[in-house]
Amino acid sequence: ALSRVCELFDSPVIHVGGDECRWEEWEADEALMERMHDQDVTNGADIQRLFLSHCAAVLATFGRRLAGWDEIVGMAGKDLPADALVLGWRENGLGARDARASGRQWVQCDADLLYLNRLAGAIEEEPTGMNGIITPQRISEELPSLLNGERLIGVQAAAWSEFLTTPDLLFYHLFPRLLIVAEVAWHGEAALPWSEITPLVEEEIMTLQSAGIPCRPLT
């Protein structure tokens, strides 16, 4: 399957996931564990480690680079390819901590600040979204301090779709917050302060709305 992905897509980086893996489901499968025993694999963690190694080997034959969530750092250990790209998503700085410590290039994806499917304001005032409030102002004020560290090469915002059931709802969650993410990602710690970025974002909101794209009010 991974070979087919490489045939279909010419991206130099292929993301293989690696997060939130329920090892106990594998470990409860007697036939699977018996098969894995022949490869000296005795638990779910080792199965995932073997899978990651296999993915890395397949991607290498196609000249592609493996990417995965920050859990792959502890999972693969020394077997993690030197050119692997680590995406640090876990909250409370845990993802960034492990991504930074991996010695590999990494991307800041902190769920506390960059998961734009989360509410943008008080729950009673917002449409359906994931719990955890990320206001536009929070992004402006807090994201610059997260954009430091050796080998950090970029920022990724996400909008997971469990609650985003229509295009309009997706746009509402994305804008204007994604505009602020882009501003801060481009300028880093030199990004404009909230008071100065506000009028610029308001102009962009009007541009988007004139194109028929629904946006949440900035404040």
Q: Where are the regions that the model predicts?
A:
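Flexible, acidic glycine-rich loops studded with aromatic residues
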Residues: 65-73, 78-84, 89-219
